[in-house]
């Protein structure tokens, strides 16, 4: 029996983790620059998923505001997939309410750019009742 395999190019982007925010920020700028160039050079490259978060766009455009139109084109073309959250889901968000608000803000931000991806990894260690 033949099996079909899907490969989803994506990031797992922590704004800060083992380096200072500024160091991660510059790595993000490099990643986004490389992605936008890849979208232009390789029409066969299908898409890249920004890890379910939209704050990446704010962080990138803070350094490269002149790339706004290219980012918009990539999102509109379905090459750059965004949302549905604002920040990366985290076990340590304060409460379930924080996670819901994170999604609501992320959906609102995503819709400003286009259609959000209705898929994300969610891992919450809070016990169910």
Identify the residue ranges that each predicted region occupies.
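Short, surface-exposed connector motifs at secondary-structure boundaries
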Residues: 111-119
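N-terminal catalytic cores of secreted or lumenal carbohydrate-active enzymes
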Residues: 1-97, 109-111
